[in-house]
């Protein structure tokens, strides 16, 4: 983590009392902004906070889905703490969501995703990652729409899991929902990502295409 970084939690000081989505304001415990290393090469983007992150305030923590992702980060050398920790010691990784507030009974609407887009766009610009990892179908569709020239409907996270997609300024490595991954799928992602980390991925910026 950057020596000048004061905190891993919401390090860019984003609005902690946003009211742009009235229905989500009624159901959330708190806003869950990004967390991690502001100088990270790897940005992981989920759809919305689950019950655990809504409680802890930290993306991908406090529940089984979060523990599954943190376990993978540990295998990749990006998490120096236990998968169950509510404040993981991330290095070279940043975690965030399309939407920052939880609704317990439904996924976010397109309008709610749009309302949160300025937060995600700002994080992408300030972190300037080398690799974006959309976690799940909705993040993959959203990231692909924004950062590739391929029609979003051509992406399927079950097929694109553990592959590398060339984007505009970034490479994209889709990940299936951590809770729905088989052991083989998890191993495939770790193997693919370790191979990616072992090459000079920092020279991929600016390449275009799918």
Q: Can you say where each PLM-predicted feature lies in the sequence?
A:
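A polyanion-binding, active-site-adjacent surface
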Residues: 2-210
